[in-house]
Amino acid sequence: MAQAYVGQKRIRRYYGNIREVLEMPNLIEVQKSSYDLFLRSGDAEGHQDGEGIQGVFQSVFPIKDFNETATLEFVKYELEKPKYDVEECQSRDMTYAAPLKVTLRLIVFDVDETTGAKSVKDIKEQDVYMGDMPLMTQNGTFIVNGTERVVVSQMHRSPGVFFDHDRGKTHSSGKLLFACRIIPYRGSWLDFEFDAKDLVFARIDRRRKLPVTTLLYALGMDQEGIMDAFYNTVDYKLQRAGKGQAAGWVTKFFPERVRGTRPSFDLVNAETGEIITKAGDKVTPRLVKQLAEKGDINLLLPFEKIVGRFVAKDIINEQTGLIYAEAGDEITVEYDRDGEISGGLLKVLLDNGIEDIPVLDIDHVNVGPYIRNTMAADKNMSRDGALMDIYRVMRPGEPPTVEAASALFDSLFFDSERYDLSAVGRVKMNMRLDLDAPDTQRTLRKEDIIACIRGLVELRDGKGEIDDIDHLGNRRVRSVGELMENQYRIGLLRMERAIRERMSGVEIDTVMPQDLINAKPAAAAVREFFGSSQLSQFMDQTNPLSEVTDKRRLSALGPGGLTRERAGFEVRDVHPTHYGRMCPIETPEGQNIGLINSLATFARVNKYGFIETPYRKVVEGKVTDEVVYMSATEEMRHTIAQANATLDESGKFVDELVSTRQAGDFMLNPVEAVDLIDVSPKQLVSVAAALIPFLENDDANRALMGSNMQRQAVPLLRAEAPFVGTGMEATVARDSGAAIMARRGGIIDQVDAQRIVIRATEDLGAGDAGVDIYRLRKFKRSNQSSTINQRPLVKVGDKVVKGQVVADGPSTDQGELAIGRNVVVAFMPWNGYNYEDSILISERIHRDDVFTSIHIDEYEVAARDTKLGPEEITRDIPNVGEEALRNLDEAGIVYIGAEVGPGDILVGKITPKGESPMTPEEKLLRAIFGEKASDVRDTSLRLPPGAYGTIVEVRVFNRHGVDKDERALQIEREEVERLARDRDDELAILERNIYARLKSLIMGKEVVKGPKGIRAGAVVDEDLLGQLSRGQWWQLAVADEDTAKEVEALNQQFDAQKRALDNRFDDKVEKVRQGDDLPPGVMKMVKVFVAVKRKLQAGDKMAGRHGNKGVVSKVVPIEDMPFLSDGTPVDLVFNPLGVPSRMNVGQILETHMGWASRGLGIKIDEALQDYRRNGDMTPVREAMQNGYGDDFYAETFEGMEDETLLEHADAVRGGVPISTPVFDGAKEADINDALRRAGFDTSGQSIVFDGRTGEQFARPVTVGMKYVLKLHHLVDDKMHARSTGPYSLVTQQPLGGKAQFGGQRLGEMEVWALEAYGAAYTLQEMLTVKSDDVAGRTKVYESIVKGEDNFEAGVPESFNVLVKEVRGLGLNMELLDAEDEE
């Protein structure tokens, strides 16, 4: 027979032109690799220390007690096997986790009291259980308390150093105040900033600012050291007046600095006396060049030019130690009336014979005096004072001591336990400041702080650029593993404190590590993270695409991230570095826009947490197949061509100028300059956007809505892949885990709806049974109440290869994503029923279940142990008629298959009531007749209002030691039978394989001895084996020793595998039979699953893939729908006005292409019917060639056997599927060509007739096939009605919302409307008896019951509340009746 393997994949006609050299990476790799690194960090191979669990333990341990007589060290950790597998955890509401076992070593020392020397006294090692560590499932999710959750990756500011300014907002003058911030991975932030007076300040953790020199003093620098670190020194030598020369200062000349300026004095060469340039003349670049060529020149400056300069070093009298000037002092001079020097620092220096003065090289143009001015303004002069100041800022109100201040300052930035830059932070800091510290240096150094301040000062001097904090080189991704690591570290640190106290409080010689450890804080931290962290989210399981997108999310929110209110426009905006890393399209609408993003299709996260995107290398104008991944920072240095640049066969660029990206800008560049090219046109969008065909023809806003709405598409009863796809569909279905892939090649042994059994033929290991059993999930409920249902695609005897789709899941069709249906649509107005984007649908859709979906709701009830006695699940409920119990079995639980409606009992339950005191008569009666039944009340689980459906599954959970009822036992029996069936099948295949191998081993060999009736010396053949049962084959001893050994080994392997199978079976049965872990106080729990079939109806929301959404307005009989000239009625009618203003033209192109696809399919169908009549294959081949185009046909189908080709033709009778990748899809010419081949007009329009009158519409109408989705906004879930119901406690007004069974709010505007109409009585009724007049509403109810129609309104409760509130303000309000007044 033909193998199904070839006929399986529906072959798509591919319209892309660009060859893709790189396979798309696995879509959930981000999640899996990150968590894997976290869990397996203790493995020997290839992991650095300091990562994952290993890193956390190494950073917290060893723990010493307070007087250091004992140390608790970490040796290694190990994750044991999880107790329950994924499926069991889901059905039992457990967390899928593995016990974490840590080996700890306790070392006790003997301390010599006199010398203080330590010697080891005792070493104890022990394995300690440290709580459970949640494991990730195959699909990158976590099962927490039975529900699937996803941990979203977080984008945060990368650790490192950032330079910025306030954009002129702080000071009224609009002056730019520069700032620099050092952000560690954990620890205190350090900021440096300028103020309006150009002084430099430092802040620690955003507290009060201190002069930056205070910080430098605290680092152990003195004034001279500080000046030396930030400024160059220039020597001024005094030249006395003489030989016609005025007195002046000789100093070195820097020609570069005066370029383009006009000096205010003559520039004189000190050696020769020649004037280089006259005062007021411009210094030309040519002159500067000439001077530079001459080498060093000394200038003679006028005498007064030294005034206002600053001394560079302390100037001291060597003999007496007298200080004339300190580093940073300003050189001043005072003159008397005669112009003689009478005072100032200069006089002091000259009087003491100091004529060679070292001066700071500050010229107020290229170099500013900011640090020197700050030092002058700083009141501190010493390290101690500086430390005290820092202490006062960090711990206000505490009296500082030098020791405490010094310890605090050291622990802030230089203690690796408190401060961690992380490897990323160190690498970023080295890059920004040109340092070369190794990335193991994770704390700050003095050099780093000086380099930061120097960088900040240079910015103020106009050198360098500020950083762009939205650049993806400055934002990094924290994935699951890292988030979990941080959380676990918090838990361990909490635990560390407890361990320290315990080590000091016990007799350390007698305890084991186990006694010191309480693992609760660590386990609690993990639980808290998965349960309540903002980044751990309930997985969006609406369809496979929404699952994949959820795992590829990048959120800027969450702990350590931004908040919605604080995030400005810049953070949310698209940045050039997002190209190929983050999707510019897919982000939510609303207040989270731009804060939650999606990873682009080819992007990956590198070891430092930066997002990388792949490029192909271009060498000398030729594109190679070598792929390199680049982060945003690395990419800045390259010139990158776009993927759609035209290339010739050899891979050379055709055009001379190519459109490229360079450092974030787009420009045309010559071919020689290009060194990289994009890998694929779809690398800049995310998965959801890459699923939109003709995305390039849609406006971005609508594409955004299209991406978001595809995630809300409900899985339909019959999934159907789109005719017009993009080629991404199979990838999403594969990576989401919705469809089942074969783990290894083999032959299908058994198939039914529940499971697929494959006999493996590849990858067989020794001791491998060679059986793969795939259990299919049938009608399981997803997180969003949609259905998860898997269907087999293979037949018994089919050959499958590794990675082939063997079963479809929800919203997949033949292994392709299928979230909607292909329907015939027309764009035309129809009696106003498509006003405001409404959609008109044909009754055919209702009749043929085109858009029908199944939804499963879960209801649960628990029987608890109350103070008054246990609750009971039973059929025996007081005051309930037999009619209401018709669906319950004898245990009081609803049957599977029962159809239920609102108010029906699902599980009968009674609760004991409090005893009321009994009269003597009652006591007597009770003594005579025994128990009375009225001391229990009915607390049964009933279906809520508005819910209908069929019971599809019931699960009963019993506490350990509680007797099981009949229903529980029946469910248990079914489960055990299923397990036994699995075991038997696996055993059967195992036996078949083993006996086949045994037979091949002994066939044709000579027998030495055997069972009764077999003579020695016989040769093994079919006849001989036929006389024996298979079990007796083992008893044949063959002469060949090697064979005998192999047979023995095979026998042992067979026994071992049988044993393993039995053990596994017993283990599972044991788990099924034992009781369940229920919450405290719960004796028994029942879960009931109700499935409901929802057909498409008026009020349901539908959408296309291009953001064209609308609500169904009317279901029209088929005969009234517009129809085509061949009698085909249209399925949906869209409003044509929805296209031009929204600019999503992609939907029109899709409609045309889909129409062509359907037409070509019909032609293939006609050819197949011909073939069935006369057996001629030629028309079929011609139709396929016409349908797929000559080139594609020649590549794919030309040499195919007839039978296989027929299978393919049969698969595309409804329409030839095509794929048109985004930005590289079918062009207008392709669409015209396809329409022509299908026999349609290239306008894409058809003559349409009115179904009601039969008349032709006035002009041709665009009709075609479009892929339409039904979204998860169903009118059944939203609509609800209330007659009477719950009221709010305080105001006594009805509650609001469907969940509370609330009413409609009558707000102030509605009141105005009624006032405007003068409807006084209606208004009074609305505000009193229909709302919160308690007495009035009971009266109304009574009168309605009695059939009367008189009532009167009282005082609304909210008025009483108002009176009480006014009294709360101390004002007494009393109400007077009108009669009392008189």
UniProtKB/Swiss-Prot annotation:
The gene is rpoB. SUPFAM superfamilies: beta and beta-prime subunits of DNA dependent RNA-polymerase. The RNAP catalytic core consists of 2 alpha, 1 beta, 1 beta' and 1 omega subunit. When a sigma factor is associated with the core the holoenzyme is formed, which can initiate transcription. One of its GO terms (cellular component) is DNA-directed RNA polymerase complex. GO terms for biological process: DNA-templated transcription. The keyword Transcription applies. It comes from the Bacteria. This is DNA-directed RNA polymerase subunit beta. DNA-dependent RNA polymerase catalyzes the transcription of DNA into RNA using the four ribonucleoside triphosphates as substrates. It comes from Paracoccus denitrificans (strain Pd 1222). It catalyses: RNA(n) + a ribonucleoside 5'-triphosphate = RNA(n+1) + diphosphate. Keywords: DNA-directed RNA polymerase, Nucleotidyltransferase, Transcription, Transferase. One of its GO terms (molecular function) is ribonucleoside binding. Its EC number is 2.7.7.6. Belongs to the RNA polymerase beta chain family.
